[in-house]
Regions:
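Short, acidic, metal-binding catalytic loop of nucleotide-sugar glycosyltransferases
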Residues: 21-31
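A conserved acidic beta->alpha catalytic loop
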Residues: 22, 36-47, 63
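Glycine-rich, basic loop-to-helix element that forms the pyrophosphate-binding segment
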Residues: 61-78, 99
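Short aromatic/hydrophobic "clamp" motif used to bind/position activated sugar donors
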Residues: 83
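Conserved donor NDP-sugar-binding/catalytic core segment of glycosyltransferases
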Residues: 94-128
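Short, flexible, basic/aromatic active-site loop/helix in glycosyltransferases
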Residues: 132-166
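A short, conserved alpha-helix in the catalytic core of glycosyltransferases
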Residues: 159-161, 165-186, 190-217
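Active-site-adjacent helix/loop segment of glycosyltransferases
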Residues: 210-287
């Protein structure tokens, strides 16, 4: 078996049907198997997939334990030399998967490959090329170039040997040898959702190069997000679950100091955010608490983030999944 394609399903059977259909249409040069790990099984919802693609292996999880745990179950069952972790809301439209495997075969120094994300009109989705680009956006700082240059100067320097090399693969498409995935320690099961791909990329980059190539691309439809942000502003721009996962990645990859520095940034911003609003309201003849929804929402989110500090610092095995009442973005809809 050349390739195992692993999907994590969460109410995405319709996307998955069309994705698998596109794979059989465009992946004809390699033997491959498809494994689906279902985090939210609805009896009968997968019938059209299993009827048309009866060789699909379908594993049902007892609970929705997140992306990493599901991927690891698929990885354990994989028989292919190569494994491709692929989102259900994607479509193959050319020979990109064959091209990706060819790159791995020809360049053994590469540990894993990503793919460029295309929209339906085949224009590219923007994404974070490097981990420093993502780390920079975790801070709440003025957008003036002086602050941005200062922040970049404080982050560890990133050195890439070619235009294709990166240290951050987007988890919608990650291809590697199965033995490479196992050697890196597989997916970190402390992550529930989000940022697990960045953390995994960090460990994979210690084994070999991570790359994007122009001839490896997939359409990414970007399905529904149960942690969609609401009431977005420059300061209040983080989803709680996404930010918990981002902070976990920082803690695991860069240590407790890097994690605490980001939280300190938020702690400094909070009173300033309130004071600015008070002054603004007074100058306009409004009451102090007029239109302070964003300040209140930001305060509530920080309360949740700070409540996880003990677990983040100790880092014992723990699934960092927020409680329903902590999903403030959903509650605000």
């Amino acid at each position: 078996m050349d390739l195992t394609i692993i999907f994590v399903n969460y109410k995405s059977e319709n996307y998955l049907y069309h994705c698998i259909q596109s794979l059989y249409r465009h992946c004809k040069e390699r033997s491959f198997e498809i494994i689906v790990v279902d985090n939210f099984h609805v009896p009968g919802a997968n019938q059209s997939i299993l009827t048309e693609f009866p060789k699909t292996q379908w594993f049902i999880q007892d609970t929705n334990s997140g992306f990493s745990i599901a991927n690891n179950r698929g990885l354990a069952a994989a028989k292919g030399k190569y494994v491709l972790f692929l989102n259900a809301d994607t479509l193959a439209f050319d020979n990109s998967i064959e091209n990706a495997i060819h790159h791995l075969e020809q360049q053994p120094e590469i540990a894993a490959l990503g793919a460029y994300q295309l929209q339906e009109d085949l224009t590219r989705h923007p994404f974070y090329w490097s981990q420093n680009q993502l780390r920079k956006d975790l801070y709440i700082l003025p957008s003036h170039p002086i602050f941005q240059k200062l922040l970049f100067s404080l982050l560890p320097k990133e050195h890439f040997q070619s235009a294709e090399e990166t240290n951050n693969l987007v988890g919608f498409f990650m291809l590697m040898k199965k033995e490479t995935a196992m050697r890196a320690g597989a997916w970190d099961e402390d992550f529930f959702l989000y940022a697990e791909d960045v953390e995994f990329s960090n460990r994979l980059s210690k084994i070999g190069k991570l790359c994007y190539f122009e001839d490896v691309q997939m359409i990414h439809l970007v399905g529904n997000n149960p942690f969609r942000r609401t009431k977005i502003s420059f300061v209040n721009r983080f989803s709680v679950q996404i930010q918990i996962s981002n902070l976990l990645w920082i803690r695991k990859s860069y240590g407790s100091l890097a994690y605490l520095i980001i939280l300190s940034n938020y702690a400094i911003v909070l009173p300033g955010y309130w004071i600015w609003k008070f002054i603004n309201n007074i100058s306009k003849g409004k009451s102090l608490l007029f239109n302070t929804e964003n300040q209140i929402l930001f305060s509530r989110k920080l309360f949740v983030l700070f409540s996880y500090i003990p677990k983040m610092l100790i880092l014992k095995d723990f699934l960092f999944q927020i409680k329903p009442e902590e999903n403030i973005d959903l509650k605000e809809k």
